[in-house]
């Protein structure tokens, strides 16, 4: 088999066989196929697309290119949630204990964040003592006993994806549905998920700017999952403005605690219930989404979800007293209100740029080596569709330095006020097949 023949075949719009796809993935991973041939095939896929079968084969070839995590020692159906990213996305912190309170096993592998704010692990490390350095046996024991644990991404999972991802980044082939879908799904499957719930974001702060693109990506991933024996559902949700009010690590932990009590921001509360319902149904702990939702609301009300969060923190060395006393979380030295310059209705909050503003305060990383300041960030005081008076705070900056002029300028550039505006729809579509 020659790589050049595979490239020409795809260039001509023909379907590649399972063997051809495996030949490419294995050869590219072990270095016998050079970058220039891999980038030629990526470009051919970009223009000629792939069938559902090819996408499933590409996904599984990437899964099998490295180690996989075997979670079969964990009882029950392991459901994993993946978000395509966004700003102020605190859903994992709320969802993990929430669904675990209904005996859905949450065996979560999470990464650190690059960009606007930290990843889930950075957020959890805002809690004194919390660590993710668990052995595999400890991890499995905790999930079997308490239904929830988080471990750092480890091992050599999907090396083919890591290599191909870096190549796509520099060859203009990032925006290809088959390549994005197989990349995301290969990571989830290699990490041992039996079933997968996807939160595909759309809008200004999202990778997929239009609802059509988001729906196409969501359907592609759901079909891959179902074709390789992993039941998959997706939610298309809005990221034209940040989710919730908090952007920053300790601030988001506090917001997660409020949400577990049923007192969180409306949009975060709604998204968590929507995603959580799908997780509960896939884990076979409820027959319908409505039944699942009612059960989730019940464990929020009766305090079981909050207790589960405390157990989870304690199990991993964290100070669980922060749940009752969030002032023990890292605190910023300065709180600076940014007032509205005019009256009206908030018409736009550019999510990714507000994320960058939080990063300028120190809430995120520009490079892997950067240190994150867990205390700093931004609290939105208004959301799109809210009325605002002149002089009323639009946001509050939590900072550890007094001079934040460039952050204030960024806030003014990216929060717009108009005569009228409607709140955007949060949940666009549910995709189940």
UniProtKB/Swiss-Prot annotation:
GO terms for cellular component: cytosol. Keywords: Glycosyltransferase, Metal-binding, Potassium, Transferase. Substrate binds at residues 168, 187. It catalyses: uridine + phosphate = alpha-D-ribose 1-phosphate + uracil; thymidine + phosphate = 2-deoxy-alpha-D-ribose 1-phosphate + thymine; 2'-deoxyuridine + phosphate = 2-deoxy-alpha-D-ribose 1-phosphate + uracil. K(+) binds at residues 88, 90, 243, 246, 255. Binds 1 K(+) ion per subunit. It comes from the Bacteria. Its cofactor is K(+). One of its GO terms (molecular function) is 1,4-alpha-oligoglucan phosphorylase activity. Pfam families: Glycos_trans_3N (PF02885), Glycos_transf_3 (PF00591), PYNP_C (PF07831). Induction: Induced by deoxyadenosine and thymidine. Repressed by DeoR and glucose. InterPro entries: Glycosyl_Trfase_fam3, Glycosyl_Trfase_fam3_N_dom, Glycosyl_Trfase_fam3_N_dom_sf, Nuc_phospho_transferase, PYNP-like_C_sf, PYNP_C, Pyrmidine_PPas_bac/euk, Pyrmidine_PPase_CS. Belongs to the thymidine/pyrimidine-nucleoside phosphorylase family. PANTHER family: THYMIDINE PHOSPHORYLASE. Catalyzes phosphorolysis of the pyrimidine nucleosides uridine, thymidine and 2'-deoxyuridine with the formation of the corresponding pyrimidine base and ribose-1-phosphate. This is Pyrimidine-nucleoside phosphorylase. It comes from Bacillus subtilis (strain 168). The lineage of its organism: Bacteria, Bacillati, Bacillota, Bacilli, Bacillales. The gene is pdp.
């Amino acid at each position: 088999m020659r790589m050049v023949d595979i490239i020409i075949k795809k260039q001509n719009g023909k379907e590649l066989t399972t063997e051809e796809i495996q030949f490419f993935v294995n050869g590219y991973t072990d270095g016998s196929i050079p970058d220039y041939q891999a980038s030629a095939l990526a470009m051919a896929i970009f223009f000629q697309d792939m069938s559902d079968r090819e996408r499933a084969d590409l996904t599984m070839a990437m899964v099998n290119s490295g180690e996989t995590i075997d979670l079969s020692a964990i009882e029950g159906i392991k459901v994993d949630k993946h978000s395509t990213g966004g700003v102020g996305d605190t859903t994992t912190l709320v969802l993990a204990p929430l669904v675990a309170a209904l005996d859905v096993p949450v065996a979560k592998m999470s990464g650190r964040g690059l960009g606007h704010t930290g990843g889930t692990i950075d957020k959890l490390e805002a809690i004194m003592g919390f660590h993710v350095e668990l052995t595999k046996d400890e991890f499995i024991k905790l999930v079997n006993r308490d239904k929830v644990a988080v471990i750092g991404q480890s091992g050599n999972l999907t090396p083919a994806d890591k290599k191909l991802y870096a190549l796509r980044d520099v060859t203009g082939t990032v925006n290809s549905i088959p390549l994005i879908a197989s990349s995301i799904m290969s990571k989830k499957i290699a990490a041992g998920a039996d079933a997968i719930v996807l939160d595909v974001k759309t809008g200004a702060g999202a990778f997929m700017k239009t609802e059509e693109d988001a729906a196409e990506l969501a359907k592609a991933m759901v079909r891959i999952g179902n074709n390789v024996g992993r039941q998959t559902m997706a939610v298309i949700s809005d990221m034209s403005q940040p989710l919730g009010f908090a952007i920053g690590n300790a601030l988001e932990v506090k917001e997660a605690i409020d949400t577990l009590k049923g007192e969180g921001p409306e949009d975060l509360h709604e998204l968590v219930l929507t995603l959580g319902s799908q997780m509960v149904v896939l884990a076979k702990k409820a027959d319908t989404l409505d039944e699942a939702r009612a059960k989730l609301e019940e464990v929020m009300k009766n305090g079981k979800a909050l207790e589960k969060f405390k157990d989870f923190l304690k199990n991993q060395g964290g100070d669980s007293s922060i749940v009752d006393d969030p002032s023990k979380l890292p605190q910023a030295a300065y709180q600076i209100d940014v007032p509205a310059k005019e009256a009206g209705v908030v018409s736009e909050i550019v999510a990714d740029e507000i994320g960058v503003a939080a990063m300028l305060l120190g809430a995120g990383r520009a490079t892997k080596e950067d240190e994150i300041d867990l205390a700093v960030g931004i609290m939105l005081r208004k959301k799109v569709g809210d009325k605002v008076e002149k002089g009323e705070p639009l946001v509050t900056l939590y900072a550890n330095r007094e001079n934040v002029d460039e952050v204030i300028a960024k806030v003014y550039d990216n929060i717009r006020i108009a005569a009228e505006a409607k709140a955007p729809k949060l949940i666009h579509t549910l995709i189940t097949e």
